[in-house]
Amino acid sequence: MRFFHPTEYYKFEIPDTWLMAARANNFIPQEQAFTPVFDPEWPSTLIDALQITQTHTGPGMPQFDEARMVSVLRDMVKGTPLPAIWCSRDTPDGKLVLRHGRHRFHAAVALKFKKIPVSIRPHFEI
């Protein structure tokens, strides 16, 4: 199934077979966001999915690992707590940039969660 990220203007696909394997093909979220794991060192906050941008890597992105995506989708559908995605706020416009949690981010967008648990952390280029 094709999905569209409304503020980044790109399409991404999660195959129907993956959605069915995760029992996510008819999922309707009852909560604003997937359930985050509590981390006292790096607390998370719920952020509107439209406020998150990502670093674009390579032509034809995004590419997902099937086992990882099915696992993430399944956990979101079951309500299993997952780590918040990591973002930094280091763009001139102050937008949040996705740094870690690409599968969780795209799964949440595909499942139509309005908010995403985000842990805002500094980003360092190595």
What kind of region is each of these model predictions?
Residues 1-66:
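An acidic, glycine-rich, mixed-charge low-complexity segment common to nucleic-acid enzymes
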Residues 2-13, 17-18, 81-126:
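A short, basic-hydrophobic beta/loop patch
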Residues 37-99, 109:
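Short alpha-helix boundary/capping and kink motifs at helix termini
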